[in-house]
């Protein structure tokens, strides 16, 4: 599912730009640096993970089983460059309307344009933040990350039995993107979170806390904590 705003973004072009940023950032950060919001991962684990996801997604988009990459050790720059290029080349060759396997069943290959854009964006934030480096991405792109959590990821988690339905929706208001979402269904929200689109996206992906600067919580804080304590995303 995509909104009209999501459909207006050139996801494949943006994916390529963020992949390039990720690639050029790899040598700037010590591979042993901890990535604390990703459990016990260090930067080398993050890079290998995203490379593997790109490789796997290329297989899903083309409906073929990918060849395993093996255990390594890997040259991180070479590995990521190869897998990023493979994904872009695959998606470009297929075109947006080619039939593909997606996270929500059969669908168009364009699903992976969007999914891999947001996978890359969140992990680019991980990489650059772990290295103490800034990241400047348009609020409209971050808003689409929020939209994917609300319209694709959370409903999928619920459908797969990975989380129970929320008792009441959570309203998310992006002050810099002019957009509002209801996380967890329709109806009167129990609580509203107002913030920039980046902070809302990172909240949904477990990189931000409601107590962080820049997030305003109005309503039932316990309901928000309950929602965030569930598996909203894979």
Regions found by a protein language model. Give the residues of each.
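C-terminal interaction segments
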Residues: 189-234
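Hydrophobic packing residues in well-ordered alpha-helices of helical domains and bundles
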Residues: 11-15, 73-80, 113-116, 120, ...
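Hydrophobic protein-protein interaction segments
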Residues: 138-185, 192-193
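Short, mixed-charge aromatic SLiMs
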Residues: 71-82, 140-156, 220-232
